Amino acid sequence: MIHVTCNQEAFELPEGASAMDLANKMKQSHCFAGALINDQEKDLSTTLQDGDTVLFLTWDDPKGREIFLHTSAHILAQAVLRLWPSAQPTIGPVIDQGFYYDFANLSISEEDFPAIEAMAKTIAEEKFPISRQVFPDKEAALAYFSQNPFKAELIAELPEEVEISAYTQGEFLDLCRGPHLPSTAPVKAFKLLRTSSAYWKGDPSRESLIRIYGVSFPTTKELKEHLHQLEEAKKRDHRVLGTKLDLFSQQTCSAGMPFFHPRGMVVWNALVDYWKRLHQRAGYQQIQTPQLMNRELWEISGHWENYKENMYTLTVDEEDYAIKPMNCPGCMLYYKTQLHSYREFPLRIAEIGHVHRHELSGALSGLMRVRTFHQDDAHVFLTPEQVEEETLNILNLVSELYGTFGLEYHLELSTRPEQGTIGSDDLWELATKALKRALVKSQKPFIISPGEGAFYGPKIDIHVKDAINRTWQCGTIQLDMFLPERFDLKYTNAQGEKSTPIMLHRALFGSIERFLGILIEHFKGRFPLWLSPEHVRIITVADRHEARAQELAKHFSQMGIIVSVDSSNESVSKKIRNAQNMQVNYMITIGDKELETHLLAVRTRDNRVLNDIAVEQFSHVILEELRSLSLTPSL
């Protein structure tokens, strides 16, 4: 017999029992997609060993959902091959909103989707068991996939010592490291979304492929809800709203590098000004480091060796330079300009740095995926004993910042990867436990992702939920044990000796451009007043009312209210519609009555009308709404 632990409960099982056997013993096998066995993702068919710790994964767990979607990608490939046997499957990963599979030697359109979906439904209903097999060596794997040059290329690139596995469901076998569902049966709802062209390995010089995107769910109800969400997302698309509201544009001369218009810069500046006030109150100092630094710096940081293909480089006066893809190395140099003592710690250094990273053109998308963006980084230097308290301070800052925008979020703690890490076991354990204790004290929901940390330390990722329940990974808190050593950073400890500081690297917005894109979609372009590019628009009924309109505009402008005047020849109703289409928060109409009484006729963008409001009363209400960073209108 063997003894295993699941949910802090001990179980006794016979030798050779699998995770599925344990699930059956718990009478819950129908719920589970896979399992974390000793923090490693595994199939339910995995044989358990004495002393194992098991955590089952369901559709509601991110990792369980990933297993479900990965199996769905295999079902897609199997369905396509049944209908087009000469097609060549290449890769089929899980992505944020579902999955895709790339095929060579295939020409289809969306008109073929019903046939593929029907075949996928049949495959699910056939309830094929899904089994894993391991090839004895690389040669055996190459021999099996000899008719598929794409799979063969992937196999050839694997190190000799790597275990090469494949998964079988019915007549279909695919190269894959898994894990997968125990059968095709749980995939009850399957929908294809679109096709696009792609290149093998994202390289335009390689073979052209067709990419098929899809989603799947355990129930038809969940699929319908998701499709409704996709329709709502189209209405909120920041690329469409960004153009309609005159916030930003994209130009062919600079793909992935957005042009921000005056209205967009108003929103941008409101975000940045808020960020600066928040960080000043929290004890951060702000710096600015150069965008262009020489090769020597990037060699010290490790970027030149490991990240060069994503960097923009140039040679000036026979010296190699790179435009910074990250702010961290510049902050390391700033730290070294002075001597430091433990008495200064935590030392909080913040920078909104302009960074550039080369992304493939096919990956670019509005403000969400760009080649240049501003990252709101901060680097906090501290002693090991301060990690927990300072992490909690940052988590409190996270709570305040996202709460200001009305955004819900959850946290994800990623722990030490199996291989390739730096730092001692003791330091990793100390750091991970400190982050976890801070998360518990923050009283915010969090999940643990075993082995998903960076090579230089554990991290906490912040996943934001928007108005239509999509999640976006924005901020991060990373404990870095790497860069302080690479740059030989020192401080004088309490014993008067030189020590290397621990560093917390954190970003709250992440990319300001991306965060702005998220806000556009979250608010559907209807920004709260303090973020709005235009607070008030004054609309004249006739030419004789323009002088009063300009007088009011000057009055409001001097108070810090963003105001414009529409004295065009359009009808009043058309002017109001124009203002509402541009999501102006408040409209003031000036006619003969308002000219005589000096009172205001105010209309909101939701068409609420308020008459006979005194100028000073309106000013006071608007200024208070701005000051309080209110998310709801005061009138």
UniProtKB/Swiss-Prot annotation:
Recorded family membership: Belongs to the class-II aminoacyl-tRNA synthetase family.
> What job does the chain carry out?
Catalyzes the attachment of threonine to tRNA(Thr) in a two-step reaction: L-threonine is first activated by ATP to form Thr-AMP and then transferred to the acceptor end of tRNA(Thr). Also edits incorrectly charged L-seryl-tRNA(Thr).
- What name appears for this protein in its UniProt entry? Threonine--tRNA ligase
Gene Ontology CC annotations of this record: cytoplasm
Keywords in alphabetical order: Aminoacyl-tRNA synthetase, ATP-binding, Cytoplasm, Ligase, Metal-binding, Nucleotide-binding, Protein biosynthesis, RNA-binding, tRNA-binding, Zinc
The main enzyme category here is ligase
Cofactor(s) needed: Zn(2+)
GO MF terms held by the record: ATP binding; metal ion binding; threonine-tRNA ligase activity; tRNA binding
Q: Which CDD domains match?
A: ThrRS_anticodon, ThrRS_core
Q: Which domain of life is it from?
A: Bacteria
Organism lineage: Bacteria, Pseudomonadati, Chlamydiota, Chlamydiia, Chlamydiales
According to its UniProt entry, this protein's organism is: Chlamydia trachomatis serovar D (strain ATCC VR-885 / DSM 19411 / UW-3/Cx)
Q: Which InterPro entries match?
A: aa-tRNA-synt_IIb, aa-tRNA-synth_II, aa-tRNA-synth_II/BPL/LPL, Anticodon-bd, Anticodon-bd_dom_sf, Beta-grasp_dom_sf, TGS, Thr-tRNA-ligase_IIa
The UniProt record lists the TGS domain at 1-58
Q: What does the record give as the reaction this protein catalyses?
A: tRNA(Thr) + L-threonine + ATP = L-threonyl-tRNA(Thr) + AMP + diphosphate + H(+)
Q: Give the binding site residues for Zn(2+).
A: C328, H379, H505
Q: Do you know which SUPFAM superfamilies this protein is assigned to? A: Class II aaRS ABD-related, Class II aaRS and biotin synthetases, ThrRS/AlaRS common domain
Q: How does it assemble?
A: Homodimer.
